[in-house]
Amino acid sequence: MLEQIRGPADLQHLSTHQLRELAAEIREFLIHKVAATGGHLGPNLGVVELTLALHRVFDSPHDPIIFDTGHQAYVHKMLTGRAHEFESLRKKGGLSGYPSRSESEHDWVESSHASAALSYADGLAKAFELSGHRNRHVVAVVGDGALTGGMCWEALNNIAASGRPVIIVVNDNGRSYAPTIGGVADHLATLRLQPAYEQALQRGRDALRALPLVGKFAYRVMHSVKAGIKDSLSPQLLFTDLGLKYVGPVDGHDERAVEAALRHARGFGRPVIVHVVTRKGMGYAPAEDDEADQMHSCGVIDPVTGQATKVAGPGWTATFSDALIGYARKRRDIVAITAAMPGPTGLTPFGQQFPDRLFDVGIAEQHAMTSAAGLAMGGMHPVVAIYSTFLNRAFDQIMMDVALHRLPVTMVLDRAGITGSDGASHNGMWDLSILGVVPGMRVAAPRDAARLREELGEALDVDDGPTALRFPKGDVGEDIPAIERRGSGLSGVDVLALPASGCNHDVLLIGVGAFAPMALAVARRLADQGIGVTVVDPRWVLPVSDSILELAARHKLVVTCEDNGVNGGVGSAVSAALRRAELDVPCRDVGLPQRFYEHASRGELLADLALTDQDIARRITGWVAALGSGVAEAEIREHLD
């Protein structure tokens, strides 16, 4: 049946039996396609019936359907004519793992950052009203996990006050990555577990209407006290006191029930909450049985067993996890904070060892930072483990709540740099630029597992201001020994390679973090051409160490190589430091051009950006040649462009 679905219109005349068959076929399709490419399997298995109902009740794209976070939009893509493209899911030039405005008019929003859908919906509803399109409904699908984010409640406050026809579908599966936590989750759990009072009321209506003479009068009396009965039976006052109509809870795997609830909500003409209870990983035993995250996201797997087909090597995240536990055993002041991602950020083992010292604050990065500030004020040393891309959400709190007070908060930034297959909104290429403007901030970028452990320990010893460590996604690789260390403490830099005997000190090549191995490969290529290169790992990359300046003074050219946007990164910081020190040494930066990148593998993206060792060596050769010929600075730049 799925092959016959070219768009939402093809769903309108299907029978209940056909819809059930289609739902089963969609699940089978998802399991086999995502098993081959990797992706967000569990969330999509849980929204099959919900997505079918949405596209039968609402007229997309006339009625925008906005999926918060967007990782649960695979079924939406299939029903809007893209099922035939799933072989290319998350591959270069293929189907995005999130909604994509360039793919389809049915996709309105493509950022994968959570808790934003309701604000988009509020703005769209205002725009439709102002432009006279009052017959358009706006639908926002938001998970119970995303409702732990404060932005959702700011939007709910505005939506409720407006009275505009926004339908908010709460996809309640009790989880984000991990089980949802907090007061909102407790309210939703209570609603899920209570008897369905709407069913009880309906039975009462039917019985009263059947009574002779007094039936209609008794029914009216009952209807008049309905609100009081609802208030005593369940805590949906959480929504109704805001001025939002509440419909539910509805079995999210009963397509007809969901459809009826959505049609009911559509008819109100004002803001409505439709509470849909789903099961993440529904219909696939390996996902349903996965206690950790119900296969929220997976790599390539065996579709029968759900087991990974490739065993990953030692990873950066696991290395951090083990190191943090080791330090925490020695120091009771070390605590950890996660924003609803204890598993992906490596904090689950920490929580198992020290359950009273791990705080999951929900999808609330801003609160996480200020709560960490409070913990630090109280004598703790908090470690906030977060994906680099989500650090952006807490900039004001880092600046004004942590740094202004010179508090010892350590931020551990996982998935820094190019992450690849999840696309533009997951690349962690902004953190160095953001943190570089924060007074008193020290940032480390370990090149290997040994340095991660060392630099984490150094960060935990800092008691007069914030620190951050950044590392990429994936395997950590072999340790890279240093020839020597110049300087001490956080100012110490590791020399990884020196010019060959008889070569000049032509280039100081600064390899930042995970780019250190590439810097060494570049140096070998340059040595073959007779160019003398000193390779250093600055370890603590911001602020720029005096040891870097001392080394720079002995070379003809400084080149920085980093997995960050070039604007405001380490290269910018080194150039500024050289100017302040009045060192007349030219500096060139190699990094990521400041733009949004489509999904592809990390290797493919780096190759496209000419960030391979061969490409970088070629560029440096040109720069050295231009300097050696005495060409004016303007001509050098023209040559490099």
UniProtKB/Swiss-Prot annotation:
One GO term (biological process): isopentenyl diphosphate biosynthetic process, methylerythritol 4-phosphate pathway
Keyword Nucleotide-binding included in the entry's annotation: no
CC cofactor note: Binds 1 Mg(2+) ion per subunit.
GO CC, any one term: cytosol
Catalysis: reaction(s): D-glyceraldehyde 3-phosphate + pyruvate + H(+) = 1-deoxy-D-xylulose 5-phosphate + CO2
InterPro entries found in the cross-reference section: Dxylulose-5-P_synthase, THDP-binding, Transketo_C/PFOR_II, Transketolase-like_Pyr-bd, Transketolase_BS, Transketolase_C, Transketolase_CS
Residues at which Mg(2+) binds: D144, N173
UniProt keyword annotation of Transport present: no
Keywords, ordered alphabetically: Isoprene biosynthesis, Magnesium, Metal-binding, Thiamine biosynthesis, Thiamine pyrophosphate, Transferase
Binding site for thiamine diphosphate: H71, S112, H113, A114, G145, A146, N173, Y284, E365
Bilayer-spanning residue ranges: none
CDD domains in the cross-refs: TPP_DXS, TPP_PYR_DXS_TK_like
SMART domains from the UniProt entry: Transket_pyr
Enzyme Commission number, as recorded: 2.2.1.7
Pathway participation: Metabolic intermediate biosynthesis; 1-deoxy-D-xylulose 5-phosphate biosynthesis; 1-deoxy-D-xylulose 5-phosphate from D-glyceraldehyde 3-phosphate and pyruvate: step 1/1
Annotated GO MF terms: 1-deoxy-D-xylulose-5-phosphate synthase activity; magnesium ion binding; thiamine pyrophosphate binding
Domain of life where this protein originates: Bacteria
Needed cofactors: Mg(2+); thiamine diphosphate
Task of the protein: Catalyzes the acyloin condensation reaction between C atoms 2 and 3 of pyruvate and glyceraldehyde 3-phosphate to yield 1-deoxy-D-xylulose-5-phosphate (DXP).
Family note: Belongs to the transketolase family. DXPS subfamily.
Complexes and interactors: Homodimer.
Name of the protein this chain belongs to: 1-deoxy-D-xylulose-5-phosphate synthase
